[in-house]
């Protein structure tokens, strides 16, 4: 799917555009692509002109919601399939997303993109072949491309998440010249797809699964054995776990992950908000 290049509006941005016009100006300068770039936007009574295309003024917009031009009106970037999935703006520019109201990426203290960059640095992707198990919005993949990865194979199970990616200017486009053909994005369940990958075929792995209660199979010994099979000796794996409350959950997920990874043939330790492991 090709990536969207039209305007992205929040309630605040739309209000700023309208306020500028009502103040007597016919031009607004700023970003309508979530702080990826700045543009001059021409304002009129009928609406605004962005990148040589005219758009009407939007109707009433909701808070914490991003809107895109759907051809006839500005529509929220959300879908309801098996769950309500929604792209959510942040103060950092790069958006997060929610599934049934549960935020999937950290945003309280750091940009989700910068958070991904810190984790990617742990596996030193430059020149390597890398497996990205749960692609999400593609921030791991984008940071790997930025860092000079040789090749990255990324899986994402949810088609609605893949749709969000086409509307998010922070998500990497596999077809873009900047990707240079290095990103292969596949819709599929990595717990099954990994069985098709050759042994010792990747140099590093980034594993960012949903929480244990949603995708327990991605924390299983069977899956960790597959990760061990496909990664070369000395290869690094970063496994996001978050910091689940041991008192309320009754379990120490990061320590359980370390134990299973070591059984699978890794040397593992706590790192950032997850586990860093090296194939022995």
Predicted regions and their residues:
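Conserved alpha-helix/loop element of class I SAM-dependent methyltransferases that forms part
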Residues: 110-128
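Conserved SAM-binding loop of SAM-dependent methyltransferases across substrates and taxa
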Residues: 137-149
């Amino acid at each position: 799917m090709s990536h969207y290049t039209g305007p992205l509006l929040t309630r605040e941005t739309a209000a700023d555009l309208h306020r500028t016009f009502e103040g007597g100006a016919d031009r607004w300068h700023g970003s309508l692509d979530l702080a990826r770039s700045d543009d001059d936007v021409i304002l009129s009574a009928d609406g605004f002109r962005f990148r040589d295309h005219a758009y009407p003024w939007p109707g009433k917009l909701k808070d914490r919601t991003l809107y895109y031009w759907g051809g006839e009106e500005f529509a929220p970037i959300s879908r309801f399939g098996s769950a309500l999935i929604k792209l959510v703006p942040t103060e950092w520019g790069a958006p997060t997303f929610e599934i049934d109201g549960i935020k999937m990426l950290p945003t309280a203290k750091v940009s989700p993109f910068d958070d991904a960059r810190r984790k990617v640095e742990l596996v030193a992707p430059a020149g390597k072949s890398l497996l990205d198990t749960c692609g999400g919005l593609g921030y791991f993949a984008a940071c790997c491309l930025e860092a000079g990865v040789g090749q990255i194979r990324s899986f994402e199970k949810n088609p609605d998440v893949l749709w969000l990616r086409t509307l998010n200017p922070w998500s990497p486009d596999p077809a873009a010249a900047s990707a240079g053909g290095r990103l292969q994005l596949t819709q599929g369940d990595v717990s099954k797809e990994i069985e098709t990958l050759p042994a010792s075929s990747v140099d590093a792995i980034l594993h960012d699964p949903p929480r244990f209660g949603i995708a327990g199979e991605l924390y299983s010994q069977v899956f960790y054995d597959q990760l061990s099979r496909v990664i070369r000796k000395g290869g690094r794996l970063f496994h996001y776990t978050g910091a689940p409350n041991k008192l309320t959950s009754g379990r120490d997920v990061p320590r359980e992950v370390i134990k299973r990874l070591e059984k699978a043939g890794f040397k593992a330790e706590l790192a950032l908000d997850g586990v860093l492991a090296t194939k022995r």
